[in-house]
Amino acid sequence: ERVTKSSAIFDYDKLNWLNQHYIKTKKISEIANMIIPYLNQLKIEVDDRTYLENILSLGVERDYNLKNIANSLTYYFIDKIDYNNDDYKKLNMENSKPILEKIIIKFEEIDFLDQSIINNNIKQVCEELSLKFKDVGPVVRFGLTGRLKAPSIDELCFILGKDRSLERLNSLKSFIS
C-alpha cells in the first residue's frame, strides 16, 4: 500500500563500498582462493600460494572488487614490464637516470632480508642526490611495476626479491637510454 511507484535508485558507490568492506573482513587465504580464477582469466598461473598471500597482505583493501585487485597484481607475476604507458609520460625522465643508477648500486650492495634495510638505503640515495623522496620514489616505483600507484617501495622490493627488483630497475634504465 505504501510503496511508491517511482523507480528505485541503485547506488553503485555504496555497493562498491560494501564489497570493499566485505573483502577487508576476509582472511588473506580466503581472498587468495577467490582471486585465483580472476588471475587465471588474465592468463596468470599461481604456482606459489605463499607468494600470492604475501602480495595480497600488502593491501587488498585498496580496491573494491576482485577483478580490479587481480588486474592490480599483474606486475608481480610478469617477467617483462611494459614501460611505454601513460604513467611514463608523467615522469621526468631526464632526472631519472642518475636516480636509477644510484639506487641500483645501493641495491646491489645489500641483502633484501628486511624492509627497513631497503627503506634506509632509499633514504641514503635521497640524501646523496640531495633529493626528496617525492622525486626518487615515483621513479623507483615505476621501474618496479610500470605504474606510479603501487604499494610502498620497500614492500615491493621485499616481495619481488633482490634479483627481480634489480632486473626491473636495469630494464627501465635501458628503456630510457
Task: Show which residues each predicted segment covers.
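A conserved active-site cap/scaffold subdomain adjacent to cofactor or substrate pockets
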Residues: 1-43
